[in-house]
Curated annotation (Swiss-Prot):
Disulfide pairings: 574-617, 576-624
Keyword Secreted applies: yes
Alphabetized SUPFAM superfamilies for the sequence: Di-copper centre-containing domain, E set domains, Hemocyanin, N-terminal domain
Any single GO BP term: melanin biosynthetic process
InterPro entries: Di-copper_centre_dom_sf, Hemocyanin/hexamerin, Hemocyanin/hexamerin_mid_dom, Hemocyanin_C, Hemocyanin_C_sf, Hemocyanin_N, Hemocyanin_N_sf, Ig_E-set
Name of the protein: Phenoloxidase 3
Cofactor note: Binds 2 copper ions per subunit.
Glycosylation sites: 25, 358, 492, 514
Gene: PPO3
Record EC number: 1.14.18.1
Binding-site list for Cu cation B: 366, 370, 406
Keywords: Cleavage on pair of basic residues, Copper, Disulfide bond, Glycoprotein, Melanin biosynthesis, Metal-binding, Monooxygenase, Oxidoreductase, Secreted, Zymogen
Catalytic activity: 2 L-dopa + O2 = 2 L-dopaquinone + 2 H2O; L-tyrosine + O2 = L-dopaquinone + H2O
Length: 683
């Protein structure tokens, strides 16, 4: 029986033939001759002996009849794969189906080995990842970080060249020096938007977006893979939180909040020049020039035709449905957009996913928007150009237009929320529970948080193909903050033990005009920091919580190499989640005022009825849910700020009920870089 961990080796060196050594220790797959492509059939064994020497491990691949893979092979191996293209999603769907239906790990390994050298490498990675996440016999395996397998999605082409040079010239891994990523490679200070480079081009931020769409695919052969609990609502909330965080960073950098891209006929003022090459396509990611205008896309090669008029029509139909309070399914039956399921239904319509009740009527608004922008430089394939970064889930967040587009998408969801009745004081109050005070403490400072720059390494060697083996480190400069802790004083004046759900949010106190922010604006900038359950016996007591325990983030070591434990494996079971180092906004050198909000709601009202089993993936549940389980909160995502405030609550202080509290927190930024000590050169 095959060791299922060997499946992880199939992700390594994605453009090299499958029979080449994998895993960094000379492991090779003993591939049946009928599985080897015609080009290498006669030389396979000779190449294995040459590149692996005395290889340590030989993985036997069982020869089985191979299912029809022709659908998934329609996309060439050197072409660009995009989840935003429906034709590509269907190809991936077919391959996922093949992988899912293999009855044993042995047979899954066999068909995956066969497919690997015949299917587009990124499509293969995506399909095998989704299948392994959803098969009962492989879902406990930790997938390798996407950045380690396809580093070209996360670093510029010059850095890639330098890493290849370091790998080729310096034979011993221990003697190789990290290759530094420049912080100024996509634009100069003349570009105002470049002030946000540390957010848009952050490794962890882009990995989060890719991994979320991996965990929540919008198309799959088995509907249950897509139809996860509150999936559409999660699409709304996760992206809404990205926009809230982005707007906070804009205020930190003396910039106005992002303007939604409402008029598709207006030029896109911001250009973007990614400076990245696709190793699979052997092409540069195309740039987009300032003031580019969108036009209808007609690309038969991509089975793609979408017009601006289509987008307008879908938008108007969605707005009409929101105002009517219902959508129509494919049989013209009404589905009510109520205050519980409405947002979930809209999420699947607007994205749109396989769960949309009527794609013919409501279209494919979000996905096609990405495509219109991604092909704006070559909408008819006249110049044989591939999509820009907006066409790939792992690169889209690098582009300033991503945030304008998603601000527009978020406005659709907010229009639905405006139709709902505001929460009353009774809805918000937790009888007999009072939050008496809150404070945060960091490095001996109270209610003051500090950010700075930090250098961290990622081993990219598994994605560097056709170069000598051994570790090759990429060194990134990223935002970081000192860890902090919350102290919450709570009083339970009843005579019984109560269970509370602590909800912590952060939002700027002042708007871009330096005026106190009205709650209707501020609620959309409320960034969720944490959510957890507490037990409250009668009387007063203190709740403490560390920032590293956040329910929205994944641990730092899951984004970057842990320098204290360099031998720690880089495969991680639960890669979905906001990066811990980006938990709080950057702030300003002189300090910037934020309001920290804490609410303790009644957990008896909020809890979800499901068995209290240990969940393998319980981190980052706020943005990513729980694997194979219901979302762990009955309230609407973003509660209590997902609806308009009640009358008389124009400011946050007037919104508060006794079980809430808010304080001012100052976030300061220190313009220093915490560097990693350079290792001595033993070459």
């Amino acid at each position: 029986m095959a060791d299922k961990k060997n499946l992880l080796l199939l992700f390594d060196h994605p453009t090299e033939p499958v029979f080449m050594d994998k895993g960094g220790n000379g492991t090779v797959f003993d591939v049946p001759a009928s599985y080897v492509t015609d080009r290498y059939n006669k030389m396979c064994k000779k190449v294995q002996r040459r590149v692996s020497g005395g290889f340590e491990k030989n993985v036997l691949v069982k020869e089985i009849p191979i299912p029809d893979l022709s659908c998934s092979m329609r996309l060439g191996r050197s072409e660009q794969f995009s989840l935003f293209l429906e034709s590509h999603r269907q190809m991936a769907c077919h391959l996922i189906d093949v992988f899912i239906k293999m009855p044993t790990v042995d047979e899954l390994q066999s068909v995956a080995v066969y497919a690997r050298d015949r299917v587009n490498p990124v499509l293969f990675n995506y399909a095998l990842s989704v299948a392994m996440l959803h098969r009962s016999d492989t879902k406990d395996l930790g997938l390798p970080a996407f950045a380690q397998i396809f580093p070209d999605r996360f670093i510029d082409s010059q850095m890639l060249r330098t890493m290849r040079e370091e790998s080729f010239v310096v034979e011993r891994s221990a003697a190789r020096l990290p290759v530094h990523s420049s912080v100024k490679y996509t634009a100069s200070d003349l570009d105002v938007e470049h002030r946000l480079w540390y957010f848009r081009e952050d490794l962890g931020v882009n990995l989060h977006h890719w991994h979320w769409h991996l965990v929540y695919p919008n198309t799959a052969p088995d509907r249950s893979i897509v139809d996860k609990d509150r999936r559409g609502e999660l699409f709304y909330y996760m992206h809404q939180q990205i926009i809230a965080r982005y707007n906070a960073e804009r205020l930190c950098n003396h910039m106005a909040r992002v303007q939604p891209f409402n008029n598709l006929e207006e030029p896109i003022a911001e250009g973007y020049f990614p400076k990245m090459d696709s190793l699979v396509a052997s092409r540069a990611f195309p740039p987009r020039f300032d003031n580019t205008r969108l036009s209808d896309v007609d690309r038969p090669i991509n089975q793609l035709r979408v017009g601006i008029d289509d987008m307008k029509r879908w938008r108007e139909r969605i707005y009409e449905a929101i105002h009517q309070g219902y959508v129509l399914d494919a049989n013209h039956k009404k589905i009510v957009l109520d205050d519980v399921k409405g947002i979930d239904i809209l999420g699947n319509i607007i994205e749109s996913s396989q769960l949309t009740p009527n794609k013919t009527l409501y279209g494919d608004l979000h996905n096609k928007g990405h495509i219109l922008i991604a092909f704006s430089h070559d909408p008819t394939n006249k110049h044989l150009e591939y999509a820009g970064v907006m066409g790939d889930a792992s690169t889209a967040m690098r582009d300033p237009i991503f945030y304008k587009w998603h601000a527009f998408i978020d406005n659709l969801f907010q229009e639905h929320k405006r139709q709902l009745s505001p929460y009353t004081e009774e809805d918000l109050t937790f009888p007999d529970v009072r939050v008496q005070s809150i404070q945060v403490e960091s490095q001996g400072q109270v209610n003051r948080l500090t950010t700075f720059w930090q250098e961290s390494d990622v081993d990219m060697s598994r994605g560097l193909d056709f170069v000598p083996r051994g570790h090759v480190l990429a060194r990134f400069t990223h935002l970081q903050h000192h860890p902090f802790s919350y102290t919450i004083e709570v009083e339970n004046s009843s005579e019984a033990t109560r269970y509370g759900y602590v909800r912590i949010f952060l939002a700027p106190k002042l708007d871009d005009g330096n005026a106190t922010m009205l709650l209707e604006q501020q609620r959309r900038m409320m960034v969720e920091l944490d959510k957890f359950v507490v037990t409250m016996p009668p009387g007063s007591h203190t709740i403490t919580r560390d920032s590293t325990e956040s329910s929205v983030t994944i641990p730092f070591k899951r984004t970057f190499r842990n320098m204290d434990n360099p031998g720690e494996p880089q495969n991680f079971l639960c890669g979905c989640g906001w990066p811990q180092h980006m938990l709080i906004p950057k702030g300003r050198a002189e300090g910037l005022s934020f309001e920290l909000f804490v609410m303790v709601s009644n957990y008896e009202d909020d809890k979800v009825d499901q068995k209290p089993e240990d969940c393998e993936c319980s981190i980052a549940a706020s943005y990513c849910g729980l694997r194979d389980r219901l979302y762990p909160d009955r309230k609407s995502m973003g509660f209590p700020f997902d609806r308009q405030p009640r009358s008389g609550s124009e400011l946050l202080e007037k919104f508060l009920t006794p079980n809430m509290c808010s304080i001012e927190v100052i976030i300061s930024h220190e313009a220093r870089t915490e560097k990693i000590p350079e290792l001595p050169d033993h070459s």
